[in-house]
Amino acid sequence: MHEPHLDRRLFLKGTAATGAALALGATAAPTASAAPGGFPDYTYVRTLLTPSQLAYNPTGEIIFPTVRGVYDRLPASGRLGRYYLYYAPHDAPGGICLAYGDSLEGPFREYPHNPIVSNKWSPHYSVSHVSSPHVMWHAGRKEMWLYFHGENTTTRLARSTDGIHFTYDKVVLNTSMLPSGTTETSYARVFPHELPSRVAHYVMVFMVNNTTNHRDIGWGWSADGRTWTFAQEPLVRHGDVGAVNVGGPHLLHRNDSTYVVYNKDKESGGDLMITEVGNDFSLRRHLGVFYDSRGSAPENGRAAAPSFGTDHGVPYMIYEAGERLAGAIAMARG
């Protein structure tokens, strides 16, 4: 499968990488078998987190993992492990959670004080739930930037110097910034990506829904990661790939081009799909299935919301496995 694009150190190191690279966005190490776009194929290995085994388990489900290597970003004295894995329940009250480990193979240990961000944060908001954590390392600020939603109409930003304790920043996306009739703007991921023609250094991809109740992939661009401009037309439409709904997008970069990987709803196949958008986001080349979800547990016909990283040169995909709102966090190896 792929690798992420924005923090290029990961995959640009390819097979020569000796440390684990975070999965913000990079170029994947070559393998004998390749997925569309020349990315390595990923094969399911094991489940990393199961709701029933977690101390903080308000709803019996967890979604939307983001894995980040912190071994060379955070001071060793306060670091819990080489990798931080963020995830959340979705249903109320949700809550942004953290697990940590020293290898992308696992095991990951639950942070004992989850949730690290809750659905009530006075005086900033009080909502039914917060979920879908995406954490980006901001190299210029030397901070971990957390993008998350709550409600599904609103995507927010909080910032941290240690990846655990966050300070609220602002709303970065809500339905009022998209065309009339938009009902959801959530499940966002943000990546460093240069768009010179738009004077932008960051790109956001996210799920957008409207009154037709068919979910598409939206996108936007920003000079600073805080103030955004959003395309008023979807980046990927559900009908373009034969789905009722698409979501969980992630950018990847390989062979001097940019791709978006995203999931279909289970009824439409439950697979991860890939579309080449190009470095300037002018392409719409739908390349088909990126990862074919298995019918057996834990996937049970659905894989979603992938995050990517490398560990000692080996590419990994950490993703949501199983029925919508009944799944676990799984790991596949390239």
Named regions from a protein language model:
Residues V246:
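Donor nucleotide-activated moiety binding/catalytic core segment of transferases
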Residues P133:
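Short, solvent-exposed interaction modules
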Residues A34-S128, M136-S186, F191-A243, H253-N300, ...:
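Beta-rich carbohydrate-recognition and catalytic domains
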Residues A303-P306:
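Extracellular glycan/ECM-engagement signal in secreted proteins
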Residues M1-L6, A17-L24, S33:
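N-terminal secretory signal peptides
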